[in-house]
Amino acid sequence: MQKKWSQLIENGLVTIKNENGATLRFSTESGIGIIEADGYAFKDLNRNGKLQPYKDWRLPISERIEDLANQLTISEIAGLMLYSGHQAVTSSKNSFASMFAGTYDGLALEDSTAVVSDLTDQQKEFLTKDHLRHILVTVVESPEISATWSNNLQAFVEGLGHGIPVNISSDPRHGADANSEYNAGAGGDISKWPEALGLAATFEPELVRDFGHIAGREYRALGIATAHSPQVDLATEPRWMRFSGTFGEGVKLVTDLSEAYCSGFQTSEKASEIHSGWGYTSVNAMVKHWPGGGSGEAGRDAHYAFGKYAVYPGGNFKEHLKPFTEGAFKLKGGTEKAAAVMPYYTISTNQDLKNRENVGNGYSHYLVQELLRDEYGYDGVVCTDWGITKDHQEMDSFLSGKDWGVEELTVAERHYKVLLAGVDQFGGNNEVEPIMAAYELGKAEFGKEFIEARFRRSAKRLLRNLFQVGLFENPYIDSAKTKKTVGHPDFMKKGFEAQQKSIILLKNQNNVLPVAKKQTVYIPKRRLKASKDWFGQEIPAREFLPVEAALVEKYYHLTTDPAQADFALCFMESPQTSGFSIEDLAKGGTGYVPISLQYRPYTARLGRKESLAGGDPLEAFSNRSYYGKSNEAINEADLDIVIETREKMGNKPLIAIVAMKNPTILHEFETLVDGILVDFGVQTQALLSLLSGEVEPSGLLPFQIPDKMESVEKQLEDVPFDMTCHRDENHNSYDFAYGLNWTGVITDQRVEKYGLKS
């Protein structure tokens, strides 16, 4: 038989090119070899010298999956069901990285002879002992180090068992650093885009599709094959902490963006395609959070025990499903559906009318098996959100377990309930023992045949996401290609242009904008009180200039004297408050306080006297009402600074730039300023390019901006477009799809298609 393949050994990797067939790559250190058949080469992944179907790249993926799934032991399948806790690949000692640091031969990185791309002791243990093959990576030192670490992972597991590769995943990592500089033609560490709300503010599904395509290529160059995104929760509750990670509250827009995002990430083209749109540049999209997490009562978030209930006072549950069922599950790129789904932590209160069960979505047989799988025909991977099988010890801890509604069950029983609900995978769990205990519970209740079939059904789903992106043939990364791909100048350019398109001009009194370059600008410092981040880490009080002076100087002369300034810029953030107060608890209260979207202290005069949902083993009450209670924003000084700056500037132009994480009450300062720009996580340079007239604003509001907190209290958590909107002194209503360009209110095809009158 004529040989139809060639071989190259370089940098410890064997690369085999089959004529008109797959390119294979494996490590010289892993101990595997090749099998020859019909003149072609195949990886002998389990080192038995036999060309079994799962090794044969010529066969349909379904046959390969069936073969391998039936060979796996229950323990190996249980390992596939694990999705690791957060892994940091960095030498940084900041608080975030330190939380996820490992050891090297028992030593900290700086005390060992290891380099940052080596595997930690903990990683080696869960890869071998627990058969874990799905890893969530957070911060990485550099693209090249990420690629090397990925290769080290793949080489390590290649010589184990059946040679199943690792599926590395990531939460969104394309956010822009405000003070970084964009240089046309220059590359970067990764392309920089606006956050999800900013992508939504473009009202351009094709831009989002382009983002997915670019970000997917960058992910694969980093070794990442699964994206824990998009977050397509319909953001109908304006106070929600995760509002900025969504595409807003318009179901038609969110649905189209969901489709575009997933198609962009998942679709491979031409030579990169393996089959049906899937291939070597594809990234599995894990769409979240089923069945929609945007209706938490009073805006509280289910990462915390104080926010575990989603409510539906408007009876609008089904509309929250549409971004999934009409978007992520109806893709145009050939891959058909998002490869994975993540249910949210929330208890979707009183939505299970059949079983009358109020448990976290990942535990709900009705929401996962009956609704998602049976009614909507979804047979992809379902993965829990992180840590739902662990106990919670505090009401306000981000890192505590999220065992909502099943607190009385043992850890093994929780795993078992998740599996019976139709879920395949456990986010944030590194240990196989509880899954094996769940297997034994199933065997005792239903018999070995039933529970084994249940495990193999999940194995097939999980293996599909490895096969369809080509990891069995070539899981390795070329570091030189990584350097060329990640942060490529073309990608950086498109990301920067998307940032510019995402900026919304809300107010332009007397056409004060644009402001010609080389004028003199005054930018006051921001003042923030002490606070805590998501993880409970203390952030000290501070005063700081909100922009990099050198960046501003490229456009305008910067002065600290308002008298010398031609105009002023006030950089603000939307008000920051929490719906739970340890101080209130310490004073004998329940801890529940209102989340405020205004800068001045707020007292709830219209809040519910009885909450719609409540109850927790750590609480002796079930009424989570905050009626009559008060709260204040840690950044109230943002408003003070606007008032002070107006006094200092007299009648000279004052522009407010609001970094908006949530819809913000603007009536407190709108009449004091001449212009308002809304920023969704963009570089300062993008803002300056618009302020100076280099580009024209085109962003549109993907949500409503309320006139006052009373409107927020009256709206229903699950219903969109039910607030009275702010109307400015020019009589413009800050409603969904509103925005200005230099000539006035935008009325283009986007508004016609997605606006409230469409």
Range-by-range predicted roles:
Residues M1-S758:
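Glycoside hydrolase catalytic-domain context in secreted enzymes
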